[in-house]
């Protein structure tokens, strides 16, 4: 059923571990860039194929495992090593071609704005690395997902991820001082809503640590 298919697609979200795995992005424009920005951060080995590739995508090569192939997509380009293909182009017939090949090989395929050609969908992401908030409409309305993401973007501070960094710094010491799980949970709930959190969000982790441990 459609509901069952949506649940299956939802299971494979964009937090899947792709480190050192081969992925293909078809398209070299703004949409492809959005997909690439999260994909390269997973540590995936990514190939981009498109007749024209945006300068912002080219710039990603400097720090990430990214291979650029400046040519029109052909079925031969989708080789068996690719575990995931993202089709981010409106070139006629390309999404259908890529979908047919990927499905036949039992691989994951996501065609932007074509949920009928996807066996994996990706939620809209609010990125406060390493905190990531995923918003999904299960493929019913990508525009709604992006709208909700916009609401959250306005409300979640840019430094929110620093709270996770603070937790990482204090992980071992809190386990030693507070061996009881419930006590440790209460401690963190207090920290995340107090002055230590404010300091961390402002990127003053030393001050945040002092406030947390005083």
Give residue ranges: language-model regions.
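Residue-level detector of alpha-helix initiation sites
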Residues: 29-31, 92-93, 139
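Single conserved hydrophobic/aromatic residue that forms the stacking wall/gate
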Residues: 1-11
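ADP-ribose/adenylate-binding Rossmann-like module
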Residues: 84-89, 95-122
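NAD(P)-binding Rossmann-fold cofactor-contacting core
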Residues: 34, 42-60
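An accessory alpha-helical subdomain
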Residues: 139-214
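Glycine-rich adenosine-cofactor-binding loop
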Residues: 14-40, 166-174, 184
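Conserved SAM/SAH-binding loop
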Residues: 71-75
């Amino acid at each position: 059923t459609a509901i069952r298919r949506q649940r299956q697609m939802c299971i494979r979200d964009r937090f899947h571990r792709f480190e050192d795995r081969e992925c293909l992005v078809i398209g070299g424009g703004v949409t492809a860039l959005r997909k690439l920005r999260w994909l390269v951060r997973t540590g995936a080995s990514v190939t981009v194929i498109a007749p024209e590739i945006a300068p912002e995508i080219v710039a990603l090569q400097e720090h990430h495992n990214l291979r650029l192939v400046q040519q029109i997509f052909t079925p031969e380009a989708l080789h068996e090593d690719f575990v995931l293909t993202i089709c981010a182009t409106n070139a006629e017939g390309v999404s259908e071609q890529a979908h047919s090949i990927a499905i036949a090989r039992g691989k994951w395929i996501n065609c932007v704005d074509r949920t009928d050609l996807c066996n994996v969908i990706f939620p809209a992401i609010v990125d406060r690395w390493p905190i990531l908030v995923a918003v999904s409409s299960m493929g019913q309305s990508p525009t709604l997902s992006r709208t909700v993401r916009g609401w959250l973007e306005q409300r979640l501070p840019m430094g929110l991820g620093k709270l996770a960094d603070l937790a990482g710094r204090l992980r071992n010491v809190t386990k030693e001082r507070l061996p009881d799980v419930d006590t440790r949970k209460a401690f963190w709930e207090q920290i995340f809503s107090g002055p230590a959190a404010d300091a961390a969000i402002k990127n003053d982790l030393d001050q945040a640590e002092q406030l947390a441990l005083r």
